[in-house]
Amino acid sequence: MDIDDILRQVDPSSHGVPSEARDLQALTRLWVAERSAPELLEWPTDGLFERVNARIKTQIEKVEDMTGDMDPKTNFALIVIQTELERYKFLMRSFLRARLAKIDKHTLHYLSSQELRDRLSPTELSYATKHQALLHNHYLSSFLASFPQQLQNLNDTAGNISMIDSPDLDTAVFIRMLRDKDVYGKGTDADITLPATNGDVLIIRWSSAKHMVDVGDAELV
């Protein structure tokens, strides 16, 4: 089973699917979306990561209890549990690394407004704040201290030119349509609106795709 197989399975909100499968589908979707989007996406607030972390902890304890048992049947079950455990751990690590890479690259940007700070988890916000403070102190001790006071800010916007480096929202992304909809896209020469049906895969600027992804009309792939 590959990523597309997981994403094509039944809707994760369906009550007919076990909660473990729904969480795995949701985590996989978040992982794919975070790696595909050029900017940091909203941190999930539905308790998904708390449930996944609790499940990982339970599975680790189960593996520790089963380790050392020489029964072949138990050993086979142990292999299955370890394989599932590694899948969850890989998705979690890769998802968090993708987010940290974006925070490291555009720290000031994500600290520049409350709306952007709300995208971060409490741990990420603490990390970004401390990271930026350490970086600023390093710059001060290295060279900024020799500059005039008015030139020491790293977020200066004088002359309507911002020093804050921001993500490129016009980066091209691939999206899969989740319902029939007319898709508006910005082009270099002209803008265009095209009809799209459920299941279509499109390449489009993130600035045009973001709203559709946010409201559930499409998903990143």
UniProtKB/Swiss-Prot annotation:
Subcellular location: Nucleus
An annotated GO BP: DNA-templated DNA replication
Top-level taxonomic group: Eukaryota
Residue runs in coiled coils: none
InterPro entries in alphabetical order: GINS_A, GINS_bundle-like_dom_sf, GINS_Sld5, SLD5_C, Sld5_GINS_A
Primary location group: nucleus
Gene3D superfamilies (alphabetical): 1.20.58.1030, 3.40.5.60
Record bears the keyword rRNA-binding: no
Record-linked Pfam families: Sld5, SLD5_C
Keywords on record: Chromosome partition, DNA replication, Nucleus
Keyword Nucleus set for record: yes
Function: The GINS complex plays an essential role in the initiation of DNA replication. Has a role in chromosome segregation.
Entry-linked PANTHER family: DNA REPLICATION COMPLEX GINS PROTEIN SLD5, SLD5 PROTEIN
Family of the protein in this entry: Belongs to the GINS4/SLD5 family.
Subunit structure: Component of the GINS complex which is a heterotetramer of SLD5, PSF1, PSF2 and PSF3.
Protein name (Swiss-Prot/TrEMBL): DNA replication complex GINS protein SLD5
Biological source species: Gibberella zeae (strain ATCC MYA-4620 / CBS 123657 / FGSC 9075 / NRRL 31084 / PH-1)
